[in-house]
Design a protein with these regions (language model features):
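Small/polar-rich, solvent-exposed N-terminal microdomains that initiate assembly or binding
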Residues: 1-49, 83-94
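Acidic/proline-rich low-complexity IDRs
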Residues: 10-13, 59, 103, 127
């Protein structure tokens, strides 16, 4: 399970009902929060066989109103920054820390909805055992 998938589950547990790891059709959700994994970089291999590294996740919030997009994006950033990450290892990956960037306006999408987003860097331990 990727950090984006884990973060989506954590956000869903906090009550966000419109979280996706791939952009949905507007027919499915007209105001989605999309978390996309950008890449994994291994920092070290541990003595116990696990790997420690960083996974960058792009978070994009899409809303009909500019103020709604900004407020939702700032709330998502705050909630990810303060989240309690599951202690168990889902699918071999465990999030141990997250650093979030500043939410910024990202313009509008093709249908005129407002976009706000930020990048988050997850420190992840991968267990292959």
């Amino acid at each position: 399970m990727s950090a984006a998938e884990t973060a989506a589950e954590v956000l869903a547990g906090l009550g966000y009902t419109n979280v996706f790891t791939t952009p949905p059709s507007a027919l499915v959700c007209c105001e989605p929060i999309v978390l996309s994994s950008v890449g994994w970089e291994r920092e070290s291999r541990q003595a116990d066989g696990t790997e420690r590294g960083r996974e960058r996740v792009r978070v994009l919030v899409c809303c009909d109103g500019a103020a709604d997009a900004e407020a939702t994006c700032r709330a998502v950033e705050r909630d990810l920054r303060h989240a309690v990450w599951p202690a168990g290892c889902a699918g071999g990956e465990r999030v141990v820390a997250v650093d979030t960037g500043m939410p910024l306006a990202a313009g509008r999408d093709g249908s005129g909805r407002w976009l706000w987003g930020f990048d988050a860097t997850f420190t992840v331990v991968r267990d292959f055992g």
